[in-house]
Amino acid sequence: MQGSRLVTDLADMHQRCTQSYVRRPYGVGLLIATYDQTGPHLFMTEPSGNFYEYLAMAIGSRSQTSRTYLEREFESFADCSLDELIKHALKALAASLSGDVELDAKSASIGVVGKDSSFQVIDGPPLQPYLDSILVEADAEGTSEQLVADPDA
């Protein structure tokens, strides 16, 4: 099944729940990443049944700062390696954190899907080298405050 068909069916299901007062609408938006013969796709669904395709998107509490980061950087994504894309995702996630919360391997996970690869989740210890890398980059730029937690602290 093509990703666009899956998202259309899911959005239709969400929308049907808004048509009757006896059915409770879904109260959640989803980000759905797919890869098919036409390439990679990222869809966002809304509880109302609306859906959109994006090149990059963030949803949830405080997601506007993440979207701002993604809008500023998305033109470089096509030329990025998988490792660079993972670091961009973590930087976007870190941008949405409140001042007293830090990004660490216990509170973050990254989902990866692509051509010739099935969906996989990177979390816990395998995620730590990516977090360390973005912290080093942020230190070099002087922007490391509140970016990620130091695992040795």
Predicted region positions:
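Long, low-complexity N-terminal extensions
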Residues: 1-153
